């Protein structure tokens, strides 16, 4: 998967197209990510011990990883991700600027 938790991304398709946010959780097996402030859904919850009130809760739902692009650290524009071996380690680079994405 070309994105990781903590990456700044932009949504490129769907109802939230153009929105930017940080990846909160990544699910590599399902190829899905949860992006902060994107794909907000309303969830109805029964009263429980954790939430005695119950009611409607708004939270982020996962979106497919193909619908997001990493933002270039240099320019702030969406960019594709490339891989390169440096000092025996595989690192991610931004295709537009060649900047390293992994610190």
Swiss-Prot record:
Any idea what job this protein has? One of two assembly initiator proteins, it binds directly to the 5'-end of the 23S rRNA, where it nucleates assembly of the 50S subunit.
Keywords for the protein's UniProt record, in alphabetical order: Ribonucleoprotein, Ribosomal protein, RNA-binding, rRNA-binding
Q: How does it assemble?
A: Part of the 50S ribosomal subunit.
Family matches, as NCBIfam families: rplX_bact
Question: Which family is this sequence assigned to?
Answer: Belongs to the universal ribosomal protein uL24 family.
Q: What GO molecular function annotations does the UniProt record carry, in alphabetical order?
A: rRNA binding; structural constituent of ribosome
Which SUPFAM superfamilies does the annotation name? Translation proteins SH3-like domain
Question: What CDD domains does the record point to?
Answer: KOW_RPL26
Could you mention a single GO BP entry for this protein? translation
Q: Which Pfam families match?
A: KOW, ribosomal_L24
What name does the UniProt record give this protein?
Large ribosomal subunit protein uL24
Q: Which domain of life is it from?
A: Bacteria
- Classification via SMART domains: KOW (SM00739)
GO CC aspect terms: ribonucleoprotein complex; ribosome
Which organism does this record belong to? Bacillus mycoides (strain KBAB4)
Return the PROSITE patterns for the record. RIBOSOMAL_L24
Keyword Cell division present in the record's keywords: the answer is no
């Amino acid at each position: 998967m070309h994105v990781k938790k903590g990456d700044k991304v932009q949504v490129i398709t769907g109802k939230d197209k153009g929105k930017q946010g940080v990846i909160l959780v990544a699910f590599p097996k399902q190829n899905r990510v949860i992006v902060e402030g994107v794909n907000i859904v309303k969830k109805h919850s029964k009263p429980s011990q954790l939430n005695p009130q119950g009611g409607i809760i708004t939270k982020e739902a996962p979106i497919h990883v193909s619908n997001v692009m990493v933002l270039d650290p240099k320019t702030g524009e969406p960019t594709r991700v490339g891989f390169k071996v440096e000092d025996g380690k595989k690192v991610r680079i931004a295709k537009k600027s060649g900047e390293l994405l992994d610190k």
